[in-house]
Curated annotation (Swiss-Prot):
PROSITE patterns: CH (PS50021), DH_1 (PS00741), DH_2 (PS50010), PH_DOMAIN (PS50003), SH2 (PS50001), SH3 (PS50002), ZF_DAG_PE_1 (PS00479), ZF_DAG_PE_2 (PS50081). This is Proto-oncogene vav. Residues 1-119 form the Calponin-homology (CH) domain. Residues 194-373 form the DH domain. One of its GO terms (molecular function) is phosphotyrosine residue binding.
Amino acid sequence: MELWRQCTHWLIQCRVLPPSHRVTWEGAQVCELAQALRDGVLLCQLLNNLLPHAINLREVNLRPQMSQFLCLKNIRTFLSTCCEKFGLKRSELFEAFDLFDVQDFGKVIYTLSALSWTPIAQNKGIMPFPTEDSALGDEDIYSGLSDQIDDTAEEDEDLYDCVENEEAEGDEIYEDLMRSESVPTPPKMTEYDKRCCCLREIQQTEEKYTDTLGSIQQHFMKPLQRFLKPQDMETIFVNIEELLSVHTHFLKELKDALSGPGATMLYQVFIKYKERFLVYGRYCSQVESAIKHLDQVATAREDVQMKLEECSQRANNGRFTLRDLLMVPMQRVLKYHLLLQELVKHTQDTTEKENLRLALDAMRDLAQCVNEVKRDNETLRQITNFQLSIENLDQSLANYGRPKIDGELKITSVERRSKTDRYAFLLDKALLICKRRGDSYDLKASVNLHSFQVRDDSSGERDNKKWSHMFLLIEDQGAQGYELFFKTRELKKKWMEQFEMAISNIYPENATANGHDFQMFSFEETTSCKACQMLLRGTFYQGYRCYRCRAPAHKECLGRVPPCGRQDFSGTMKKDKLHRRAQDKKRNELGLPKMEVCQEYYGIPPPPGAFGPFLRLNPGDIVELTKAEAEHTWWEGRNTATNEVGWFPCNRVRPYVHGPPQDLSVHLWYAGPMERAGAEGILTNRSDGTYLVRQRVKDTAEFAISIKYNVEVKHIKIMTSEGLYRITEKKAFRGLPELVEFYQQNSLKDCFKSLDTTLQFPYKEPERRAINKPPVGSTKYFGTAKARYDFCARDRSELSLKEGDIIKILNKKGQQGWWRGEIYGRIGWFPSNYVEEDYSEYC
């Protein structure tokens, strides 16, 4: 067996790789193992599996998203721990770039083999590799691997299932504390019985939690005051006493509400305390530092360590340490929406259900706020790592916003025309251009993105030539500029997308709507959005604030904030609507020319400032011009595929020419003129997913799709106008083949919520083939959700949503409060409290 396959088997035995990972599949290649290990996360977890707590996972970035800086940091943590705790010699270790750039993957396998033979690893009872009779000559298969590695690949989420989760540890402590003596469950429970159980659980767990806060104060804070300095006490206990005060009052009002008839006033208590629970913002943002400081003090002073053990013994017979108990408040505040969700599920009265939904929304919003504080703490740790590695940096990197992407590139400038190797860090507001010196970086230039724009340049690109893929970074005044070169076309696209996202964060759509001047802003206090009343989340740059009236808002809510300095804007909305209708009518009367998109455009370069929003274009889209001058390079138009209006470079389109009528009879799905009854006769005895497209007999210019789904035949009208075909207003196609091809790959549920299927089997295909053929382009997903609010992505890994969008849920195992989903072919993370799952009423 090849050495890399033996390594794979060993990693599976060490519970690092899932047994079903694609690297184990027939036909798997060594590059798939390299891709799985490149970010260093699994290697760090490997050491912890072999020797518990060998690495503090707080020092590891568990979601590096192929950031070269973070991946290399993880890899170097693995290598240093191999030496310090496993006794490997320096000569047995690979270099960090041997793995990240896959320069010598054979050396990586050699290091893992040496690790497998260490006494610590062998004590686990796992067979090391290679075995004595194994051949070692795998060198040929490792050559050229660096060209096969995909720097733009999405993370394989299943890979991280085995990684330890500190949140799960805190959850176990919480569940242990809240556990009550098991009460026999009646064999048959009514909905009323289940509701009573929910109410009882809410009260009992709140009593235990309040007792826990009291125990921390009584058995730890008071005794430790004589051992610790005031600043140590404040750092370790944060605002525990404030939490205790809030929950003492909350518990009293909770009991009063629960003792009332039917507990109908319970919802008011949660809504009232949402604002008071904002004190958790401070606690959750500082608890990690608190635990770290506690560990440091206990390690440095034996008397404190002994006192902590004594306190723990008195508080709970030594079951839980202070470190354990400090994790509980974070867990409790994240449980309220789950408790209320279950209560809503078993509440029958319509009015009560609606009221409880209000409380549920309030607690979901609070939970999302807490989760974002945790996420921003992780981001700030990442920024700190960047800061410590960059020399000549004269201000805090956090002032530039959140990191977008980092990596190697080549660069030319106005002053220096020859290509220079550089390492760049892109954040929301700035691009930092550095020269790498070993493990540190020397800052050469800081580009303020406020005054720059990006322009694509594909003129010199050749697919087979590295570092030929370039775009321009140009100052608005034209005095300064850079050419940025990337190794591959895919990397260039990834960087351009992140530049587009950064610029859209600085200059968001609707930033000047209703007379406002919205700018990115870091709020010191927890604040609610002026438009939707939901909380602005996180610890820095949580949203936007109007420079004039100081109104706070989410990015996605900017267009809905009342006019600057005025309270009511319903009249403005009405006027805008009437104006829009008049414009549409005028456009139709003029019969302006149509253009076909020949090159995609996603807002880079952005239109000149005075023009307006950009228009997103995809090849094949049809654009109806609204403003166009032959001598101007920027035109305005309406994309008939999306109905959006905006500006775009005129070189991205060409005149639209109606082609000759297509011969549809060549397609296996086309049935010609046919009534509904005829389609039903053909499809009734066929497999689910079998479909046909028919010409409607009553109107030969119209078409329809008939499809077998859930034992019934469904019919979908295809609307035709302006030479385009569509089954929903959201998306249009130039021809029927394009429409059919799209819905072969994308579920019809995006248009019709009860029709969760793709167009799978053309009716002219023999049934035998149709049964064996897997669904085309189907992605494994776990139900769907409907967006309740708009959401604007902040970076490339997030998914923008519009209210009413239907999202396929791919994963719920990411950072708390975030799910991974797919919509319109895009995949990314979105906040779970912005959606309603499976069209149910929260449950």
